[in-house]
Amino acid sequence: MSEKKLAVNEYLKTDSDYLRGTIQEGLDTAVTGAFSEGDQQLIKFHGFYQQDDRDLRNERKEQKLEPLYSFMLRARVAGGVCSPQQWLAVDDIASNLTSSNSIRLTTRQTFQYHGIPKRNLKTIIQDLDREALDSIAACGDVNRNVMCNPNPVESKLHQQAYAYAKQLSDNMLPHTKAYAEIWLDDEKLVTTEGEEVEPVYGKTYLPRKFKMAVAVPPDNDVDVYTNDLGFVAVAEEGELVGFNMVAGGGMGSTHGEVATFPRLADDFGYIKAEDTLKFAEAVMTVQRDWGNRENRKLSRLKYTIVKHGYDAFKAEVEKRTGIKFEPKRDVVIGDRGDRYGWKQGVDDNWHLTLFIEGGRVKDLPGQPLQTGLREIAKIHQGDFRMTSNQNIIIAGVPAADKDKIEALARQHGLMGKLITETRGHSIACVALPTCALAMAEAERYFPDFLTKVEALQDKHGFLDQGIVIRMTGCPNGCARPFAAEIGLVGKAPGRYNLYLGASFEGTRLNKLYRENIQEAEILAELDSLFARYVAERETGETFGNYTVRSGVVTAVIDAAKDFHG
């Protein structure tokens, strides 16, 4: 029997000397703004992607110039928590070392930079390192940034859950010294074949990206069921005692390929808090050993569980931990939105959640958002918490400092603008012009599109009710569109697939309703559906639930069988 042919990335990882490749040589080459094709895959493990300005592609081609290459660098910030001092450093880098001059808050509670020339990469990574920040494993076939509910009201429980998110992030880091050697000028370590450099990942790391989240009920802003691995906090008398573990979620799919599909995670049962790291490592190593390394489109954990079966996967995790799952505990999974404005925590400190449109922290006409956050960071004594809805929380504000913080926020346009429930619950990915995978606009177009949807809600008399709407430029699902009540996924310039029927809480996927349609058709469909919804809805019924109950779309129960069916 012939040996299975692995995906190209598997050979690249094997031959990379634990993620070193020829990155250093590429960094030293000034003749091009790009890295080699192989190194473009390896640099993801170091936290960045090679991109180019797609708005300028044709113009530069006519001028016989190479594309305007730049890099997107994403930081690793477990749970989205950083200090004001760190924020000031992050802001300084954005202002001085990137062409975008902005900070992009992501849907996974971290920040990323766009428009970094190759010559600035090392400086940025070293500047971040001085503030105890890094981009290790923010991308690539490893455990990515670990999410955790900011939950500013339940401060004590949040801190306990956050501590586990931080441990998960730190313990699942790659052990290779390639990052330190290349970017921080650490001395090169000589490795031999016999050394166990990566005790968890092994020489070829994971088959594909791996995403974790820690949820603190009733909040589900981290969309815990969309992750490869999720831990839902269980508390007794306000103290964290354990987690319900879920596994096998993921949003990515490919247009036209029915073997690919988004999926929500399965519930596996309750585990004690002290066993969290054991179970995380067990799930990751089962995926390492069982995952598909031949076809990267089918490499995520969700496909591994579908292929081998829930029971077999569960048994293998229990075997590797030596611990049986207990029956899952009852918890309430609720809102996925953020609590905007001031909220007081159990520690009597105050927390201010600020809405950041599209997660883009930038000075705009009449809204100098970036300057405002910079000025707040100069006087704030607590911390900054980035949310998975691309917003930011000024957390831990003593009552005596509230007025000063609010004055700065209002002065710089960070407060005072009315945010509808729908806009406050909705997110979009970056897409054009920098993302190489984007087929249509998202971040640049989404605010105007939402304004038109809000007008329809107002027309039908339910603008006070939130609908979770999400838009992505492609089906890879960075903004989790398949878990939105209204999901719009780019198909071509100006054209989107329209998905309906996810639950408001994120416990059911949506389903394709109309394919490859333009804005006018999308709005016409929503206008008609909103009219029906207002006339036919039951008391308290959300829009997503209505579209399923009324038969507009059928419920997705088992994504492998019925997402495309």
UniProtKB/Swiss-Prot annotation:
Gene Ontology biological-process entries: cysteine biosynthetic process; hydrogen sulfide biosynthetic process; sulfate assimilation
Residues binding [4Fe-4S] cluster, per UniProt: 429, 435, 474, 478
PROSITE patterns linked: NIR_SIR
Protein EC: 1.8.1.2
Reactions accelerated catalytically: hydrogen sulfide + 3 NADP(+) + 3 H2O = sulfite + 3 NADPH + 4 H(+)
Cofactor note: Binds 1 siroheme per subunit.
Highest taxon of the lineage: Bacteria
One Gene Ontology MF term: sulfite reductase (NADPH) activity
Cofactor names: siroheme; [4Fe-4S] cluster
Residues that hold siroheme according to the record: 478
UniProt entry keywords in alphabetical sequence: 4Fe-4S, Amino-acid biosynthesis, Cysteine biosynthesis, Heme, Iron, Iron-sulfur, Metal-binding, NADP, Oxidoreductase
GO cellular component, one term: sulfite reductase complex (NADPH)
Complexes and interactors: Alpha(8)-beta(8). The alpha component is a flavoprotein, the beta component is a hemoprotein.
Family membership: Belongs to the nitrite and sulfite reductase 4Fe-4S domain family.
Purpose: Component of the sulfite reductase complex that catalyzes the 6-electron reduction of sulfite to sulfide. This is one of several activities required for the biosynthesis of L-cysteine from sulfate.
Name of the protein in its database record: Sulfite reductase [NADPH] hemoprotein beta-component
Gene responsible for this protein: cysI
